[in-house]
Amino acid sequence: MAERGLEPSPAAVAALPPEVRAQLAELELELSEGDITQKGYEKKRSKLLSPYSPQTQETDSAVQKELRNQTPAPSAAQTSAPSKYHRTRSGGARDERYRSDIHTEAVQAALAKHKEQKMALPMPTKRRSTFVQSPADACTPPDTSSASEDEGSLRRQAALSAALQQSLQNAESWINRSIQGSSTSSSASSTLSHGEVKGTSGSLADVFANTRIENFSAPPDVTTTTSSSSSSSSIRPANIDLPPSGIVKGMHKGSNRSSLMDTADGVPVSSRVSTKIQQLLNTLKRPKRPPLKEFFVDDSEEIVEVPQPDPNQPKPEGRQMTPVKGEPLGVICNWPPALESALQRWGTTQAKCSCLTALDMTGKPVYTLTYGKLWSRSLKLAYTLLNKLGTKNEPVLKPGDRVALVYPNNDPVMFMVAFYGCLLAEVIPVPIEVPLTRKDAGGQQIGFLLGSCGIALALTSEVCLKGLPKTQNGEIVQFKGWPRLKWVVTDSKYLSKPPKDWQPHISPAGTEPAYIEYKTSKEGSVMGVTVSRLAMLSHCQALSQACNYSEGETIVNVLDFKKDAGLWHGMFANVMNKMHTISVPYSVMKTCPLSWVQRVHAHKAKVALVKCRDLHWAMMAHRDQRDVSLSSLRMLIVTDGANPWSVSSCDAFLSLFQSHGLKPEAICPCATSAEAMTVAIRRPGVPGAPLPGRAILSMNGLSYGVIRVNTEDKNSALTVQDVGHVMPGGMMCIVKPDGPPQLCKTDEIGEICVSSRTGGMMYFGLAGVTKNTFEVIPVNSAGSPVGDVPFIRSGLLGFVGPGSLVFVVGKMDGLLMVSGRRHNADDIVATGLAVESIKTVYRGRIAVFSVSVFYDERIVVVAEQRPDASEEDSFQWMSRVLQAIDSIHQVGVYCLALVPANTLPKTPLGGIHISQTKQLFLEGSLHPCNILMCPHTCVTNLPKPRQKQPGVGPASVMVGNLVAGKRIAQAAGRDLGQIEENDLVRKHQFLAEILQWRAQATPDHVLFMLLNAKGTTVCTASCLQLHKRAERIASVLGDKGHLNAGDNVVLLYPPGIELIAAFYGCLYAGCIPVTVRPPHAQNLTATLPTVRMIVDVSKAACILTSQTLMRLLRSREAAAAVDVKTWPTIIDTDDLPRKRLPQLYKPPTPEMLAYLDFSVSTTGMLTGVKMSHSAVNALCRAIKLQCELYSSRQIAICLDPYCGLGFALWCLCSVYSGHQSVLIPPMELENNLFLWLSTVNQYKIRDTFCSYSVMELCTKGLGNQVEVLKTRGINLSCVRTCVVVAEERPRVALQQSFSKLFKDIGLSPRAVSTTFGSRVNVAICLQGTSGPDPTTVYVDLKSLRHDRVRLVERGAPQSLLLSESGKILPGVKVVIVNPETKGPVGDSHLGEIWVNSPHTASGYYTIYDSETLQADHFNTRLSFGDAAQTLWARTGYLGFVRRTELTAATGERHDALYVVGALDETLELRGLRYHPIDIETSVSRIHRSIAECAVFTWTNLLVVVVELCGSEQEALDLVPLVTNVVLEEHYLIVGVVVVVDPGVIPINSRGEKQRMHLRDSFLADQLDPIYVAYNM
């Protein structure tokens, strides 16, 4: 790899003055810590070296020449453009709020462009669907994901010249080169922080990579489709697919990246260099860990790829706007001083005049409230509220208190009386919706409002009270989140008549609160907008002037009379002007959509208050009634004129009803908001005057917040109508929607702000939010305030056009800010509905919102699917919607979900409760029936795939390393030679001899006890019994089996003592035992082939088993799974003849083979290793010393006895050490969960061993049974060590849950620990009885993906808790090695764990002669730095060693070994290394219904399989949650999400997931998934 031009040699570095060397070293350190950039480093470094550069160049010309020979191969990351969606679709019905024929044409035109191209996307597969396709053949997704760069292209290859190879032959050159190949680091952060440093040794590794690794047979390739042929960086050879039954040997690939050589006091390098090291170490200080706060800095700048702004994006060019004033508010002499005064006036002088008419369900008038009745009943209510609810001394209500008004939408009369009654009593009404159920959508937030307003009293009608949900004993239910309320019925018969002398107190309107109107924010929180009496009055005056209201006019109100324009016009302005309101409830509109038009016709109404929805419904029902006239209407107030899509409804209504007398100038759109009240309204026009113009705006311009008349593609235009002028007496300005309230330019979209006496005054009880909304002082571009008049934010987006006309283009609440561009949710809904949806979705039942995922907002569209829509129709419609939104808005949709009809949460008036829908989506409770995720097209800010950076030069790396004061990462258990032992066992070299000796010395000493599910002893074995049983088995092997010494014998037994006897029987006969898990009788097809495979691979001459299993092996069911005719000799050992061998076999040397240990790894590889007699002896001795085992001890074992340490503990250790083993077969726990713990308690066991499966079973199964355990008298205080036997990274969370759960029954939190072993050495670590407790560290996951270790503090984001895997066993040494260069790395650096120990296996057992592989794995040497030339075995696991402050048993500082994960399990994605367990842990956390999760890769796509333990309707809820969490926490896009039934993910006896088996089943379409989602 080409390095920097001026690369001084070690000699040149040594020649530099000490202070320059020190500064250089500091600089290297800063670079490795990430404190400075590569560029800054280069600059400072060249400045430092410039005075010495001539010498440097002369001394190192050889290096220069060498560098010129090493030109790196170009590495182009091939990313194909994200695929657009191509498939023709047909579509359906629309919601007329969003209807626009122009827009529909635009959408159809946009879709037409896609017509020719086919969609390159597989349909999701759903169980019980007629459209299930095989994932393997029909569903190969396009290889176009941003996460699927071709991995070969991300790797660099270094060419090496022949001359260089020659020069590397002598040792001196090795040392110098390897020192140059080292790299900088600190104690807490490891070397590769700026990419990989590859010195010449690394290059050499490249050259020999093929001979070392690639030629050997390997497991089926799982992650790559291409592989760089000459680079060791390709972990797995490509395109080698072995048949499932193929014989596979253990093999650990060279890892792709790891930190490189770090030298210090651990391994001698060269004395000449070490003096220099000593000098530097003495002069330079050790680096410190970064301060705590640094771990919590949001590092999105480093992570996120910020999309470059489009150079052609439109920018505002106008001048800064000036606030626009409305006409002055006219002063009319007879206007009342307060609204209550107007009521008093009309109620006493015009008592017979009609005030309000209510309709029945058929739309006929049912009751008319006169002004006299309104006045008298309001008066009675006011008097009752103040005087009759409590005692005289303790009234329940005082003026200024808040009360809730709970009246249905079809009872305007009762509501009006209650509202004015409150005003007269000077209590503050808070109108809310009638709760329908205990848990209404958004009901909890209404409860929050009631609580924050301090409301204890609710007014309602008798009818409404009867309809409220009740408990069984007739009380009103306690609504979720609500305070306790007292309900008061306001029907006349319950009210007291005030005495003659009682009069309400009506003062002139001031700033005291009059009423509170609730408002739901975008997030779903409900706030109370407080309106003062003065604002209420002023607003009525402004409306009266703007609408030119006069006494006696009739107004038809179709809106909700409890809030917004329905309240202001229909309840306030009518009283102010003595008008007559006819209230048409929503329920009547549903049954008789034309009722409001009929009311206008019948009453010759002058004004109608409607929404676009009402216009649309009237048009739909128009044919039912032809003889209506709307000629009396002077104003048709369209109150949702602020919706940009209202223009088409208005146009359509006018064209239909103009023939019925509707005047074009009568249509008056207006814009309102809860905070600013009426923002603008179009005044009633003069007949014959030209109608206001339209604005045809570019959607692209709008997305950048700029007003541009649309000239480009007419498909992406938005036509908006004005909403008239500013209100009388008001002033309006437009400010930027985000940041400080800076005035916009004239061609810029912003938030409309209004200043007048007619707006709200505050959010009740929320001072902080109030200031930002109700007290806004606009500033100019320099940031200085413009005037001192406070404005109110209206929450509407728009601009002031020519002639001071106000245009609204959307709401702040509907704003979706995606990748720096603004989109309006309503616009997206309109586009979705313009895609003809025929039978797919319901109009008006679409929700659009954004969710924040990976540092940006992502658009989610949710719609209700019609029950009769087919899967195919739905999928077609969804695909077309994606195309349409992409074409028209140039934005991708992250997720499109269809839910069953009527399942979206509704608002009280029947709309969709958006925030609640979003909440359900995020918590996984939406239950979609169809879903499409498109993360590949939307997520454009992923970090660039990692590419190897040019490394820091070898010499400077060397210096930097010395600065860090690093020691080599190595650790060792106690030295076996120093341990004094006077044990008689030591004189025996073979385990069989020890058993014979014990049978003579202590014949009756019980070694084994086997328990059943009830906890009773079913079998015991004393030394003599075991010896005799073994003799008889040995005899049978000779007689029946005709076996010779050295023949392999498969032992097929359930966990028990028979298995142990058979093992020693084989040793006595000189045969080689191979323990195999028996097949599962109920699942032969899955379990028998593994047995067959081990029998074949081990070339077994005979199978020892029980009668039951023998019958099973030869059964018809077995014949369906394997060839039963070719089994070797099968001997059942149930009834043995009483015969013994004349002479027991004694192996000639301890190096002879004792037994074979076969195991299937998590990657699906079957590996057999050879264990010699000396290794067996050494293993047992190490365990005996570590656990202090001797004859009087008793241990309990609850794990599988077929391989690894589990086998050794079950079968070997008791015979060696003489302790008693209580054997608990794990499968018995399924029948009795208490078995293991009750056994430990019963026998007062101090040391117990189990597997993760057992621990998980107890944690999950006994989680809520701790009290039962206590009552049974189970106490675990006797337990000193509870050891989990594992070959993986410790599962800290499970261990902690177990400890926490059972601490209540005495389990010491210090007791639980784990072991660590691998195929090459089954027992490397085991906690044991002495030495410090296992330590834990938090490491940074991001660094781990780069093969670095960075220690962080607890709670740091992206941190991973790692626990030490027990203590290293006596006689065991480990070193951490860079798997590529085979050079040792420094303390706290990540690398492969290599082990040296007398009990290491002697090699793989294989039918091929792979001597080289054996050498590479079992007898390999460090490439440099080890004068002793120790032989090491490669474990295939990544980990690191860290020296702690604790003291080991030897008295020295303790070195902790941390296991990170198996190399061959890791996934290489986007140039980074991922451990599947980390992704799985994230996924398992997201939803309560996920039982288990496993991940693997398929054609460069990440596949996530989740087991669903809930109901099947939750299956699709998991798809977005899985996609979100993997994106957020791991920066990866999930390609396929597969939802399966519990138990589908195969797990082996050690509790490890068999991901490769799962992958094979997935590709063979054998999973029977509930749902398969292919993310686009």
UniProtKB/Swiss-Prot annotation:
Compartments, as annotated in UniProt: Cell projection, Dendrite; Cell projection, Axon; Perikaryon
Pfam families: AMP-binding, AMP-dom_DIP2-like, DMAP_binding
Tissue specificity remark: Moderately expressed in adult brain, placenta, skeletal muscle, heart, kidney, pancreas, lung, spleen and colon. Expression was weaker in adult liver, kidney, spleen, and ovary, and in fetal brain and liver. In the brain, it is expressed in the cerebral cortex; the frontal, parietal, occipital and temporal lobes; the paracentral gyrus; the pons; the corpus callosum and the hippocampus. Highest expression levels in the brain were found in the cerebral cortex and the frontal and parietal lobes.
Record's GO cellular component terms: axon; cytoplasm; dendrite; extracellular exosome; membrane; nucleus; perikaryon
The keyword Phosphoprotein is annotated on this UniProt entry: yes
UniProt entry keywords in alphabetical sequence: Cell projection, Neurogenesis, Phosphoprotein
InterPro entries per UniProt: AMP-bd_C, AMP-bd_C_sf, AMP-dep_synth/lig_dom, ANL_N_sf, Dip2-like_dom, DMAP1-bd
PANTHER family, alphabetized: DISCO-INTERACTING PROTEIN 2 DIP2 -RELATED, DISCO-INTERACTING PROTEIN 2 HOMOLOG B
Function: Negatively regulates axonal outgrowth and is essential for normal synaptic transmission. Not required for regulation of axon polarity. Promotes acetylation of alpha-tubulin.
One Gene Ontology term from the biological process aspect of the record: nervous system development
GO terms, molecular function: alpha-tubulin binding
Bias (Low complexity) ranges: 70-83, 155-167, 182-193, 223-234
Quaternary structure (record): Interacts with alpha-tubulin.
Modified residues (Phosphothreonine): T71, T140
Family: Belongs to the DIP2 family.
Domain DMAP1-binding, chain residue ranges per copy: 12-131
Phosphoserine modification, residue list: S9, S50, S53, S100, S146, S148, S153, S178, S193, S203, S259
Disulfide bonds: none
Name under which the protein is recorded: Disco-interacting protein 2 homolog B
Main location: other
SUPFAM superfamilies associated with the record: Acetyl-CoA synthetase-like
